[in-house]
């Protein structure tokens, strides 16, 4: 049990490393991490709980060459495989080149629930970074995965591709269920930008009760890329149910996105099942 009232970490601590770097654990295999945080939501998915003391408030990879080159960097765990993380809140400053997340950098067949992130700095200045997520940089599931009760307070204002408020990239070889996830931060990047997920790949991904309150900005964009309040782009079919976007979506001039939408920006193949969803914000494209 990770209790921030007992486990007190110096906020000035600095962690430096190349791959699989985490504020608490670098690589976690077949393990469980449990804290004391529980996010509370209103009936309309507004966060009503107070921001608690974080498990890790330090600094990860703020110096060269780590900030430009590191992969699988997480505020709690860098790389997690066949593991479970729950009830964790962190507030790091974090940098990396790819698969960077506020809780986990790269999550393989891992379940995550009741977690929150409010970073001081999130990858600021690394505009070539890919797969950046407020909670998880990239999630890859070859067996059934569930993610629930997740909240991101952090702005992510730089990045190249697969940038999302909760997940940068979601790859599903089997069924994935995402339930009650909320983004409050501004998400601004170049390609495949989403309030909840940057881009999905896989035919059995279901999103329920998601809400985005942050501004979503597409900076440049290219064909086969999208910008969306919930998901930027989907490589295959996706189901989005009872979800809402409250954040304005803005696209810079001369951008070449295939699409921008209040819920979903672009679907490449297989179609999308969008039911009982609502966009309550402006789209400037």
Regions picked out by a protein language model, each given a short descriptive name:
Residues 1-285:
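Predominantly extracellular beta-rich ligand-binding scaffolds that present long acidic/polar faces
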């Amino acid at each position: 049990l990770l209790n921030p009232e007992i486990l007190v970490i110096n906020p000035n601590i600095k962690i430096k490393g190349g791959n699989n770097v985490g504020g608490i654990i670098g690589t976690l295999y077949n393990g469980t991490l449990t804290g004391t945080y529980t996010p509370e939501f209103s009936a309309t998915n507004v966060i009503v709980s107070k921001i608690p003391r974080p498990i890790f408030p330090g600094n990860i990879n703020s110096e060269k060459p780590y900030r430009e080159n590191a992969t699988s960097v997480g505020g709690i765990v860098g790389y997690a495989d066949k593991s479970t993380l729950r009830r964790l809140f962190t507030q790091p400053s974090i940098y990396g080149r790819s698969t960077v997340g506020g809780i986990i950098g790269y999550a393989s067949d891992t379940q995550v629930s009741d977690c929150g992130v409010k970073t001081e700095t999130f990858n600021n200045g690394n505009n070539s970074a890919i797969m950046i997520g407020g909670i998880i940089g990239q999630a890859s599931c070859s067996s059934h995965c569930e993610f629930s009760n997740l909240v991101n307070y952090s702005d992510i204002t730089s990045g190249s591709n697969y940038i999302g408020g909760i997940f940068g990239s979601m790859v599903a070889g089997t069924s994935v269920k995402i339930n009650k996830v909320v983004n409050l931060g501004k998400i601004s990047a170049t390609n495949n930008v989403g309030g909840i997920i940057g881009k999905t790949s896989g035919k059995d991904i279901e999103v329920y009760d998601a809400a985005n309150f942050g501004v979503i900005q597409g900076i440049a964009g290219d064909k086969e890329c999208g910008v969306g309040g919930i998901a930027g782009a989907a490589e295959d079919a996706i189901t989005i149910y009872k979800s809402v976007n409250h954040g304005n979506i803005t696209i810079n001039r001369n951008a070449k996105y295939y699409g921008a939408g209040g819920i979903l920006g672009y679907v490449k193949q297989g179609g999308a099942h969008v039911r009982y969803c609502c966009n309550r914000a402006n789209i400037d494209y």
